[in-house]
Amino acid sequence: MSQNLIRIATRKSPLAMWQAEFVKAELEKIHEGLTVELLPMSTKGDIILDTPLAKVGGKGLFVKELEVAMLEGLADIAVHSMKDVPVDFPEGLGLEVICEREDPRDAFVSNTYKTIEDLPQGAVVGTSSLRRQCQIRAARPDLVIKDLRGNVGTRLAKLDAGNYDAIILAAAGLKRLKLEERIASFISAEQSLPANGQGAVGIECRTDDARVKALLAPLEHAETRMRVTAERAMNTRLEGGCQVPIGAYAEIDGDTLSLRGLVGNPDGSQIITASSSGSTADAEKLGVALAEELLSKGAKTILDAVYANA
């Protein structure tokens, strides 16, 4: 492959394409003479749309095909939403870069209502995320939660067709697709703890590819890496995939990293929370320790039940 060419494996969804185009533009801006090509692909998570994600099962639903393309030499890098990236990588691949994080919050989207509090009793809310479901149900047990799959455009179309009174989406995706005007209100991390890595973009490549690693290096964002490292470490210790009722959110102030974690029963009947803070240098340790605290409070019982039903 040409020394002046990088090929990006990406999902075909508009949001995935935006992320790949963003990385392409950044690389071409930094490295004069570099050509970046996109290799759009369909993944298992994109193809199976009639089944709730929790039942499709497996970690890495949206990344496996992209990884095969890199291992076979068809692509040099893959660009992912960090919340979709499994903890373990196939031999020969690794997470080389985490770019600066966009807004990590969830967004409340409705054509009629401004906030979750405004929804009338029995209103229908669309989300396929068990993490969002458990937090909404805990706050508003009177609401009806209906599954919602598909890319951002498909989900908005289902809302507009009257299938739902409101839907919950990641704020970052709507902002990136220039759909911020669809957001009725942002849901604070206090109200809905985000997923680990939410709003951050990661770049995966072959671990032995020194040329590509050197080209990618300027895109690394140290603070985002520390925050996401803590969140992912917590998720890993809990053995969470991308479809679990787990929330994790880290913030940094100076050299101090504060981490909040949550595990909830999808029916909203029980929400277990914990928080801790420490040095940014200990991001991974903090994540593991917070997971241990959640487990000591009964998180394993909830997660075992979720996996048994999946």
Swiss-Prot record:
Residues bearing PTM S-(dipyrrolylmethanemethyl)cysteine: 242
GO MF annotation terms: hydroxymethylbilane synthase activity
Name of encoding gene: hemC
Any Gene Ontology CC annotation: cytoplasm
Subunit structure: Monomer.
Class of this enzyme: transferase
Keyword Transferase: yes
UniProt remark on cofactor binding: Binds 1 dipyrromethane group covalently.
Reactions that this protein is recorded to catalyse: 4 porphobilinogen + H2O = hydroxymethylbilane + 4 NH4(+)
Functional note: Tetrapolymerization of the monopyrrole PBG into the hydroxymethylbilane pre-uroporphyrinogen in several discrete steps.
Protein's name in the database: Porphobilinogen deaminase
Matches recorded under SUPFAM superfamilies: Periplasmic binding protein-like II, Porphobilinogen deaminase (hydroxymethylbilane synthase), C-terminal domain
Entry's family note: Belongs to the HMBS family.
The species this protein was found in: Shewanella pealeana (strain ATCC 700345 / ANG-SQ1)
